[in-house]
Regions:
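N-terminal targeting/trafficking signals and adjacent low-complexity tails
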Residues: 2-3
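N-terminal first-folded block
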Residues: 7-44
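Solvent-exposed alpha-helical segments within well-ordered globular domains of core cellular machineries
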Residues: 11, 31-34, 54, 58, ...
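Structural motif
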Residues: 20, 40-41, 66-68, 87-90
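Short, ordered loop/turn segments at secondary-structure junctions
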Residues: 27, 47-48, 72-75, 95
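N-terminal positively charged helical leader segments and presequences
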Residues: 37-57, 65
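Mid-chain, well-packed structural core segment of small domains
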Residues: 56-87
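C-terminal structural segments of small proteins and small subunits
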Residues: 78-112
Length: 112
C-alpha cells in the first residue's frame, strides 16, 4: 500500500502543479504563508535540511496551515512536479487537492 500511496501522492502533486495550484520551493512557500490567501497544505521532503524542516513547521504552525513531512526525498519531489533540481517543500493552494494530498501523505507516513 505504501508504494501505491507514494505513486499516487507524486502523481497528485504533478497534477496540482500543472493546474497552477502548487507553490514550489521553501522560500516561495514561506512568502505565500504570509499572503492574503496562503496555501492550505505544505508538504516537506524528509531529507530536507533540519533548518528547512524546522522553519517550515514553525511558520505553518504560526500561520495555522497544515504541514506534513513526508518520506520522500527532494529529488523525487522535484521530479514529480517537473523541476530538474531538488525541491524541499511545496504548498498546495486548492482545497480539493489539499484534502487528497493530505490523505495520501498521512497514509504514506502511516498516520491515517
Amino acid at each position: 500500500m505504501t508504494q501505491d500511496a507514494k505513486k499516487a501522492l507524486l502523481g497528485m502533486l504533478g497534477l496540482c502543479r500543472r493546474s497552477g495550484n502548487l507553490i514550489c520551493g521553501s522560500e516561495l512557500v514561506c512568502a505565500e504563508l504570509s499572503a492574503k490567501e496562503p496555501p492550505l497544505l505544505v508538504i516537506v521532503a524528509a531529507d530536507a535540511s533540519n533548518a528547512t524542516v524546522d522553519k517550515m513547521t514553525k511558520k505553518c504552525f504560526h500561520d495555522q496551515v497544515e504541514c506534513s513531512v513526508v518520506p520522500l526525498d527532494t529529488g523525487e519531489l522535484g521530479h514529480a512536479i517537473g523541476k530538474t533540481g531538488a525541491i524541499a517543500s511545496v504548498g498546495v493552494k486548492d482545497k480539493n487537492f489539499a484534502k487528497r494530498i493530505g490523505e495520501l501523505a498521512n497514509i504514506l507516513k502511516g498516520t491515517n
